[in-house]
Amino acid sequence: MTDSSQSAMPPAKGSAVKGTAFSILGAISVSHLLNDMIQSLILAIYPILQADFHLSFVQVGMITLTYQLTASLLQPLIGYYTDKHPQPYSLPIGMGFTLSGLLLLSVASTFPLVLLAAALVGTGSSVFHPESSRVARMASGGRHGLAQSLFQVGGNFGSSLGPLLAALIIAPYGKGNVAWFSLAALLAIVVLLQVSKWYQHQHRATKGQPKSPSLLKPLPKRTVAYSLGILLVLIFSKYFYLASISSYYTFYLIHKFGVSVQNAQIHLFAFLFAVAAGTIIGGPLGDKIGRKYVIWGSILGAAPFTLVLPYASLYWTGILTVIIGVILASRSPPSWSMRRS
């Protein structure tokens, strides 16, 4: 996931941060895992929600739209505000929104309440990501690539766990078992309270200190505009594809191959796990053959497998989606955003 607060400045000279704070990086990575696990859980139970509320595919899309409007569009606004006014305790507060959304979803009896629950979970995500990414950078001790990699990998593997846990805990027993995942949100709140205390201490220690001068020569405006344009196209295409697969892949498997909801959720887990693995594989591969080739290869490489997908058997559908997930995610390993080509 692209987080708006990666532009936060590294700790200035004289900061209380001495070296890489691995305990904080571990805590924020675990919190990211729990947060993104809960986010993907919402997508994984779409077939259950459709059956319970007799939803059309348009209504399923409305759930995704509501979630994305709060989780994605709010995030840069919150990041912009917290860049100017850091809010250390926004981390547990954001997870509180997620907790509220989970509890509401577990007892929701109407479609509007499901939409409200999705909005609360999305709001929690939009509050969590900017400040948690900032914390990862602050705790890096200058090793920004390592810090962002640990942070992002936690989120990616959390995303893959959601469908698997939904298949084991929710699908056999019903929507009410969503409430059990509030324990994960509570655990994240406890962890984030400790992280927030550390964050507040670092903020006070560096307040009023001059920012470290940049050692990089500014790029021409035309180069920056062109690079940002390409980046936006890549991000849009990746997340458009991911949102489409995450929202409708389970329905596709159920309707075309007649598999159970649990089986479909396990296939979704395999796809999202492949996405997480692709993020890790893309880094060393890019270092070896060049990041530019990996980026363009990931764009063109997924296309032939996608075109074959509608004609594949269930077995080959599972294989193809895993390959697509690895290729698609290899274009954006987390540490690349911290480097200059």
Spans of features found by a protein language model:
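C-terminal transmembrane helical hairpin of 12-TM major facilitator-type secondary transporters
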Residues: G286-S335
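Extracytoplasmic gate region of multi-pass secondary transporters
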Residues: I42-L43, V224-A276
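Helix-breaking motifs and short loop linkers at transmembrane-helix boundaries and internal kinks
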Residues: H54, P86, V107-P112, G141, ...
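Conserved MFS/SLC helix-loop-helix module at the cytosolic interface between two early adjacent transmembrane helices
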Residues: L73-P112
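Helix-loop-helix hairpin linking two adjacent transmembrane segments in secondary transporters
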Residues: F151-W198
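Residue-level signature of mid-helix packing/kink "hotspots" within the transmembrane helices
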Residues: S40, Q68-P76, S159-S160, L272-I280
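Flexible cytoplasmic inter-helical loops of multi-pass small-molecule transporters
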Residues: F181, Q194-K217
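Cytoplasmic helix-loop-helix junction between adjacent transmembrane helices
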Residues: A117-G154
